[in-house]
Amino acid sequence: MKKLKLHGFNNLTKSLSFCIYDICYAKTTEERDGYIAYIDELYNANRLTEILSETCSIIGANILNIARQDYEPQGASVTILVSEEPVDPKLIDKTEHPGPLPETVVAHLDKSHICVHTYPESHPEGGLCTFRADIEVSTCGVISPLKALNYLIHQLESDIVTIDYRVRGFTRDINGMKHFIDHEINSIQNFMSDDMKALYDMVDVNVYQENIFHTKMLLKEFDLKHYMFHTKPEDLTDSERQEITAALWKEMREIYYGRNMPAV
C-alpha cells in the first residue's frame, strides 16, 4: 500500500482483542480447587502487570497509568493507559508480516490502552477446568496492534485462541480524501510467525468491506499428560483415558466452534 500523506493526525482506531484458553482435567474436587488456585496465582494481577508492562517497554510505549485488581474467589484484571514517543510515520512498516518476537520488538502506541481480564472456571461435576484470558490492545495513530500479537501469544501459551481485529473511523489525506484503513491486511494469520502457525489449526472469518478480521486457532497436537492436573495418564485405566480424552476434546471443540455439541 502506498504511504499516505495525511492532513493532521491519523484518526484511525485499531483494536486487537483475543481470548486464550487453557484446558485441564482435574479428577477430584481437591484437584479442581488446586488447579483454580494454581492458575489464579500464576496469572494474578502482579504477573499480568509485569507481562503488559514488558509489552509496553518492548514496543516503546510510555505508561501513563496502571489499574489492577485481583478478585475473590478468583480472577484478575489489569488496564494500562499508554502514549507513544515521537515517531516518524514514514518509518512505520505497514506491510503484512509477522510481528517480531519479544527480544526484537520496537514500535510505538499512541493514545492507547492495553487491558487483560482472567476467568478461571470449572465444571461442577465433569472434572473439566478452563482458564480464559481476555486481552485487548487498542491504538490510535499509525501503528497497528497486530505487531504485538506474536509476543502476547508466546507469553500466554494456550490450547485455543480466538482473535478479532478491527479498524474504525477514518483519516484524511492532504487532498481531503477519506481513508478507512491505512495498511495492508488479508488475514490475521499473516502477522503470525511460521512456528506459531505450525502449532495450530486455523480458520478465518473476515468481513473485508467492514475492515473486520477474525481468526480461530486450535492446538494440533493432543497429549493427555499435558491436560492432567496431579494425575498421570499411566495411573488410569484404558477406559478412563479414553473417557477423559473424549471429554477434553469435546470441550475444546465446543470452545473453538462456539457451540455445544452432542456427546459422541
Curated annotation (Swiss-Prot):
One Pfam family matching this protein: AdoMet_dc
Cofactor(s) for this UniProt protein: pyruvate
SUPFAM superfamilies linked to this entry: S-adenosylmethionine decarboxylase
Annotated GO MF terms: adenosylmethionine decarboxylase activity
Cofactor note: Binds 1 pyruvoyl group covalently per subunit.
Modifications after synthesis and translation: Is synthesized initially as an inactive proenzyme. Formation of the active enzyme involves a self-maturation process in which the active site pyruvoyl group is generated from an internal serine residue via an autocatalytic post-translational modification. Two non-identical subunits are generated from the proenzyme in this reaction, and the pyruvate is formed at the N-terminus of the alpha chain, which is derived from the carboxyl end of the proenzyme.
Keywords: Autocatalytic cleavage, Decarboxylase, Lyase, Polyamine biosynthesis, Pyruvate, S-adenosyl-L-methionine, Schiff base, Spermidine biosynthesis, Zymogen
One Gene Ontology CC term in the entry: cytosol
InterPro entries per the UniProt record, alphabetical: AdoMetDC_fam_prok, S-AdoMet_deCO2ase_bac, S-AdoMet_deCO2ase_core
Keyword S-adenosyl-L-methionine listed: yes
Pyruvic acid (Ser) PTM positions: S112
Superkingdom to which the source organism belongs: Bacteria
PANTHER family per record: S-ADENOSYLMETHIONINE DECARBOXYLASE PROENZYME
Subunit structure: Heterooctamer of four alpha and four beta chains arranged as a tetramer of alpha/beta heterodimers.
Family: Belongs to the prokaryotic AdoMetDC family. Type 2 subfamily.
HAMAP family noted in UniProt: AdoMetDC_2
Function: Catalyzes the decarboxylation of S-adenosylmethionine to S-adenosylmethioninamine (dcAdoMet), the propylamine donor required for the synthesis of the polyamines spermine and spermidine from the diamine putrescine.
UniProt name for this protein: S-adenosylmethionine decarboxylase proenzyme
Lineage: Bacteria, Pseudomonadati, Pseudomonadota, Gammaproteobacteria, Enterobacterales
